[in-house]
A protein has these predicted regions:
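Charged, low-complexity, helix/coiled-coil-prone segments
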Residues: 5-21, 69-76, 146-154
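Short Pro/Gly-enriched coil loops immediately N-terminal to beta-strands
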Residues: 1-2, 124
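Short acidic, glycine/proline-rich loop/turn micro-motifs
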Residues: 10-11, 52-56, 111-114
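Acidic/histidine-rich helix-loop elements
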Residues: 14-22, 114-121
Length: 155
């Protein structure tokens, strides 16, 4: 057993927010049981964390976060929960596992941490999240711009 990849569908047709329903969480519990004692990465669109960006949190993962945290904690081998949706690079945790929200490969959203903050596009450079995991070293996450820039220049 090497590293196991698990994808979860958080999309709700016709709605901006995400959910994890009981059927999907039951499936995840059974899948994690097959991976007992083995490293796992979970991938999903809506991140299972509160970012502090009020407008995005209001339409984020609105159902299933608590049970997901319980399943992740019980398994103990989840190396990463990777997500997107927020159009910003964000790092947090859930159930003892790191949550990494990749930045957007198009536009970013303005960082607005006011309690009643709104949504605004910020024309920051597009980026991607790259994940590297080895049994010896564990996880490293890199955010990389996808546009060409001068360099590299030796230091």
């Amino acid at each position: 057993g090497g590293l196991h990849f698990i994808g979860l569908d958080t999309m709700v047709p016709g709605r901006p927010h995400g959910e994890l329903d009981d059927a999907q969480l039951d499936w995840l519990a059974a899948t994690l049981a097959h991976c007992t004692g083995q490293p796992v990465m979970i991938f999903m669109h809506h991140p299972p964390l509160t970012s502090g960006m009020a407008a995005m949190d209001a339409c984020g993962l609105l159902r299933g976060r608590e049970r997901l945290a319980e399943l992740v904690r019980a398994h103990g081998g989840v190396q990463l929960i990777a997500a997107g949706y927020m159009h910003r690079g964000i790092v947090g945790a859930l159930g003892g596992a790191p949550v990494v929200v990749a930045p957007s490969c198009s536009h970013q959203l303005a960082l607005d941490l006011r309690p009643q903050g709104g949504l605004a596009v910020q024309m920051e450079p597009p980026q991607v999240g790259l994940y590297r995991w080895t049994p010896q070293d564990g996880l490293a996450c890199h955010f990389s711009h996808v546009q060409a820039y001068p360099g590299p220049f030796p230091v």
